[in-house]
């Protein structure tokens, strides 16, 4: 097995942590990240660091997919796995990454066939008030 080509991304844990925290804040928003960090305990601190370094400092840094595409995938996966808190969080992230309400709706329609109508139905119920809130808060 050959060694993958370097991506030019972060290499050390500290670089991954810094890049991950920056990306996490850009995608999820400062308010969410501040709550997650403030809510960290000695029991959860290592897990929060793991998420920041691996999910945000490694996976979301890879050049193969744009953040917008990663958001599409994340929405679909969280619906399929019925992880509703993560789904709600990533509806907001998807908007931050440039997805429209219509595109989010299309993801959920697609999920109805591949992940089940009950999951997609619940996803619409979770997404609707979030999208309404974001529309109301957006300067038009």
Model-derived features with residue positions:
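Short alpha-helical scaffolding segments that buttress acidic/His motifs in well-ordered protein cores
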Residues: 51-55, 72-79, 107-114, 123
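Alpha-helix N-cap/helix-initiation sites
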Residues: 62-70, 84, 101, 105, ...
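Mid-chain, well-packed structural core segment of small domains
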Residues: 75, 79-105
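Substrate/cofactor-recognition hotspot
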Residues: 117
């Amino acid at each position: 097995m050959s060694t993958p080509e370097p991506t030019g991304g972060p290499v050390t844990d500290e670089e991954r942590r810094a890049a991950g925290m920056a990306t996490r804040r850009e995608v999820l928003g400062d308010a969410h990240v501040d709550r997650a960090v403030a809510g960290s305990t000695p029991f959860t601190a290592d897990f929060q660091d793991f998420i920041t370094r691996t999910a945000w400092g490694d996976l979301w840094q890879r050049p193969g997919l744009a953040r917008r595409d990663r958001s599409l995938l994340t929405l679909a996966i969280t619906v399929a796995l019925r992880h509703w808190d993560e789904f709600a969080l990533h509806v907001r992230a998807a908007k931050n990454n440039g997805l429209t309400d219509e595109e989010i709706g299309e993801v959920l329609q697609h999920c109805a066939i591949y992940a089940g109508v009950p999951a997609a139905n619940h996803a619409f119920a979770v997404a609707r008030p979030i999208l309404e809130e974001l529309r109301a808060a957006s300067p038009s």
